[in-house]
Amino acid sequence: MDRFVWTSGLLEINETLVIQQRGVRVYDGEEKIKFDAGTLLLSTHRLIWRDQKNNECCMAIPLSQIVFIEEQAAGIGKSAKIVVHLHPAPSNKEPGPFQSSKNSYIRLSFKEHGQIEFYRRLSEEMTQRRWETVPVSQSLQTNKGPQPGRVRAVGIVGIERKLEEKRKETDKNISEAFEDLSKLMIKAKEMVELSKSIANKIKEKQGDVTEDETIRFKSYLLSMGIANPVTRETYGSGTQYHMQLAKQLAGILQAPLEERGGIMSLTEVYCLVNRARGMELLSPEDLVNACKMLEALKLPIRLRVFDSGVMVIELQTHKEEEMVASALETVSERGSLTSEEFAKLVGMSVLLAKERLLLAEKMGHLCRDDSVEGLRFYPNLFMTQN
C-alpha cells in the first residue's frame, strides 16, 4: 500500500480511461484496510481508486510499478480478486495513504463482479505498455525514472529476476491454454454451422423432414443453449450488464417470437431464456431491467405492459390494429368466446388471449358479458350495424 499516492482523480494530458468498476475493496496483502468500497479506474498510465462515499479520497498507482498480476477465484462468502504484485516504492515517491508497508502486493476485491473484463483490460495494458510510448505529466514520470533505493538494496535484482522468470512461465502456460481453447472454438464453430443447417431444414421443411423430426430438432437446438451467456462476472452489475443482456435477448428471442405470432408473456420468456442459459441462471429483476432497455437500444423486440400490469415481449413489427382485427374476426365467426376458448383456437396462453380480448374491448370492437359462468366476449354490434 505504500506505492499508492494521493491524486485528484483527474486524467492527465495524453492519459486515457480504459475501464472502471464500482464496489471494489483494496487489501494490503492479506490485511483488510479502511478502503472498503470504491470505484476502481484503469487508465493507460495508472490504477486509480476513488471512495464512493467521499470523492475527495482518491489514490493512484502508476502501471509502471506493477510487476505482474494474477486472478484469485471467488469462494464461499468471498468475492473474486485480482492480485497485483508491485515493485518497491521509489525513494522520491509522493505522499500517499501509507508511508511504509511490509507487503509487496495488493489485492482488489470485486464485490459487484466485473473482475473478468477488468483483468483482461489490465493485462492488455501491461502487455502494450502505453505509458512508455505516450508520456504524461512530470508527476507521473517520476515513478518511471531510476529508483535509488533499489540500487542500494542487495538481492532486489535477484528477486526481480525470479519474478520475471515466473511471469514468462505464466505467459507460456497461458499460451498453451489458449491453443487448447482455439481448438475448442473450432469445434464450436462446426456445431454452430450444424445448428444453422438444422434450423434451415426446419424453416424450409425440405426433403423428408417430418413433423416429429421437426419437434425433435427444435429440442436439440434448445438443449444446446446459449454459447456465451452474458454474466455479471463479465460485465459487472450496472447498466453495461443489462445492455449486453438486452442485446443477447434480442438475438435468442426473435425466432421463438415469430413462431408464436409475435408476442410472448414475460413468464414464458423467463423460462425459455433460463433453460437456454443452463447453469448461468437469470434473476427476474435482471430480466425485467434488460427488457426495459430493448426499445431504447432500437432492437427488433420490445417490452410492453398492458393496463392490467401483465408484461409481454413482442416484435417491433407486431401491430396492435392487426392483433385486434384478428381477435374480432375470430369472435365474430364463433358468435362469442371466453378467453380459454379463444386461447385454444389461436394457440396461445390464456393470459395473452385474455389481454388480446380486453384490448379489443377497450378499442370498442368487443363487448363483454360477465356472469357466474365467467367472462364472455361478443362482437360490438353498435360498431358494425346501423
UniProtKB/Swiss-Prot annotation:
Subcellular location as annotated: Cytoplasm; Endosome; Late endosome; Membrane
GLUE N-terminal domain mapped to chain residues: 1-88
Q: Which domain of life is it from?
A: Eukaryota
How does the record comment on the protein's domains? Answer: The GLUE domain (GRAM-like ubiquitin-binding in EAP45) mediates binding to ubiquitin and phosphoinosides.
Q: Which InterPro entries match?
A: GLUE_dom, PH-like_dom_sf, Snf8/Vps36, Vps36, WH-like_DNA-bd_sf, WH_DNA-bd_sf
User: Which positions are tagged coiled coil?
Assistant: 160-185
Q: Which family does it belong to?
A: Belongs to the VPS36 family.
Protein source organism: Mus musculus (Mouse)
Function of the protein: Component of the ESCRT-II complex (endosomal sorting complex required for transport II), which is required for multivesicular body (MVB) formation and sorting of endosomal cargo proteins into MVBs. The MVB pathway mediates delivery of transmembrane proteins into the lumen of the lysosome for degradation. The ESCRT-II complex is probably involved in the recruitment of the ESCRT-III complex. Its ability to bind ubiquitin probably plays a role in endosomal sorting of ubiquitinated cargo proteins by ESCRT complexes.
Know the name of this protein? Vacuolar protein-sorting-associated protein 36
Going by the UniProt record, its keywords in alphabetical order are: Coiled coil, Cytoplasm, Endosome, Lipid-binding, Membrane, Nucleus, Protein transport, Transcription, Transcription regulation, Transport
Matches recorded under SUPFAM superfamilies: PH domain-like, Winged helix' DNA-binding domain
What Gene Ontology terms describe where this protein resides (cellular component)?
cytosol; ESCRT II complex; late endosome; late endosome membrane; lysosome; nucleus
Q: Name one GO molecular function term.
A: phosphatidylinositol-3-phosphate binding
Whether Cell membrane counts among this entry's keywords is: no
Q: How does it assemble?
A: Component of a complex at least composed of ELL, SNF8/EAP30, VPS25/EAP20 and VPS36/EAP45. Component of the endosomal sorting complex required for transport II (ESCRT-II), composed of SNF8, VPS36 and two copies of VPS25. Interacts with VPS25, SNF8, TSG101 and CHMP6. Interacts (via GLUE domain) with ubiquitin. Interacts with RILPL1 (via the C-terminal domain); which recruits ESCRT-II to the endosome membranes. Interacts with ECPAS.
| Record domain GLUE C-terminal: where | 105-138
State the Gene Ontology BP annotations.
endosomal transport; endosome transport via multivesicular body sorting pathway; protein transport
